[in-house]
């Protein structure tokens, strides 16, 4: 028995393939004792095996699969309210604000990362960025202060949130310990790329009913719709499986459903596991990505694995 264990340890040391849940600790997620400075990811983060799904709840971390932060517009968008966003953009003459606030130039999104993220969090964030790198032409690049004035500042504030599109300067994206999951990070970064939530579409009432009596007090504005002067559907159908869609219990004040689908194909509504095919196509259309894999119509938009089953969010 000891011989088997010895050989196993040697194999792990040589091939670095034996990352187990037992070696994850809270400081490998976020270590607030570290002075907060701006860093970037390195090659080791992008090639690490540490991103493999880990149950953060075993560390006492409250996981935020579907954040419902009442102080933010639509739960995780850093705006005062959807209405204010529309009013501000009306003042701008409704200038090409279709589905994005501002598009990032050259399909590159510069970023910096808080030094408080540990090795596990860094690998998960890198894996989420890799989803964009392999399926779209959008690239997250380490900020070069000499040429990047506008950039994302990814740090552990309170909850998970992002602004929509490029807003200028040092632009915050918050990923606290409960947000360190690949799907949740992909979702927040998709806001930064330029997308609102799927159920904000003008045509959403043809696909879902909002059960207003089940919505928590003061949260009605979390279900605002944007008209086509503000967002574009990019000629894509409504997507229940989008990583940008709310789950059925979002902002529930009673534990009952707030969103009820009207059509079939909604089994994974609210999933936070991976892009749907339509998500990928929309990003590629928005950024004019040429010949990027993932633009095919292989009719598997709703084929998300069993880990994506949506549970009642903590509200």
UniProtKB/Swiss-Prot annotation:
InterPro entries (UniProt xref): Astacin-like_dom (IPR034035), MetalloPept_cat_dom_sf (IPR024079), Peptidase_M12A (IPR001506), Peptidase_Metallo (IPR006026)
Secreted is among the record's keywords: yes
Cofactor list: Zn(2+)
SUPFAM superfamilies: Metalloproteases ('zincins'), catalytic domain (SSF55486)
Highest rank taxon of the organism: Eukaryota
One Pfam family linked to the record: Astacin
Binding site for Zn(2+): 187, 191, 197
Residue ranges, annotated region (Disordered): 291-315
Keyword annotations of the record: Disulfide bond, Glycoprotein, Hydrolase, Metal-binding, Metalloprotease, Protease, Secreted, Signal, Zinc, Zymogen
Ranges of residues in domain Peptidase M12A: 95-290
An annotated Gene Ontology molecular function: metalloendopeptidase activity
Top-level class of the enzyme under EC nomenclature: hydrolase
Cofactor-binding details, from the entry: Binds 1 zinc ion per subunit.
Active site (UniProt): 188
One of the protein's GO biological processes: proteolysis
Compartments (UniProt record): Secreted
Entry EC number(s): 3.4.24.-
Function: Metalloprotease. May be involved in digestion.
Matching PANTHER family: DISCOIDIN, CUB, EGF, LAMININ , AND ZINC METALLOPROTEASE DOMAIN CONTAINING, ZINC METALLOPROTEINASE NAS-4
Name of this protein: Zinc metalloproteinase nas-4
């Amino acid at each position: 028995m000891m011989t088997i264990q010895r050989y196993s340890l040697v194999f792990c040391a040589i091939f670095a393939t034996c990352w187990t849940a037992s070696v994850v600790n809270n400081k490998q997620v976020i270590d607030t004792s570290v002075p907060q400075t701006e860093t970037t990811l390195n090659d080791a983060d992008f090639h690490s095996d540490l991103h493999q799904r880990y149950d953060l709840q075993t560390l006492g971390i409250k996981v935020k699969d579907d954040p419902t932060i009442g102080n933010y517009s639509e739960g995780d968008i850093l705006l005062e309210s959807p209405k204010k966003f529309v009013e501000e953009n009306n003042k701008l003459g409704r200038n090409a604000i279709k589905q994005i606030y501002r598009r990032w130039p050259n399909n590159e999104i510069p970023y910096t990362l808080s030094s408080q993220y540990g090795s596990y969090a860094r690998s998960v964030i890198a894996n989420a960025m890799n989803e964009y790198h392999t399926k779209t032409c959008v690239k997250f690049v380490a900020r070069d202060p000499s040429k990047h004035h506008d950039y994302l500042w990814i740090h552990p504030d309170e909850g998970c949130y992002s602004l929509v599109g490029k807003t200028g300067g040092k632009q915050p994206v918050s990923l606290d310990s409960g947000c360190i999951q690949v799907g949740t990070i992909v979702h927040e970064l998709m806001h930064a790329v330029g997308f609102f939530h799927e159920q904000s579409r003008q045509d959403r009432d043809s696909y879902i009913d909002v059960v207003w009596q089940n919505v928590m007090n003061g949260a009605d504005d979390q279900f605002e719709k944007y008209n086509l002067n503000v967002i574009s559907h990019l000629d894509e159908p409504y997507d229940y499986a989008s990583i940008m869609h709310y789950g059925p219990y979002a902002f529930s004040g009673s534990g009952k459903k707030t969103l009820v689908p009207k059509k079939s194909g909604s089994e994974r509504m609210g999933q936070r596991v991976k892009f749907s095919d339509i998500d990928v196509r929309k990003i590629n259309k928005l950024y004019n990505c040429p010949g990027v894999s993932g633009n095919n119509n292989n009719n598997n938009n709703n084929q998300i694995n069993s880990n994506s089953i949506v549970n009642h969010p903590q509200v």
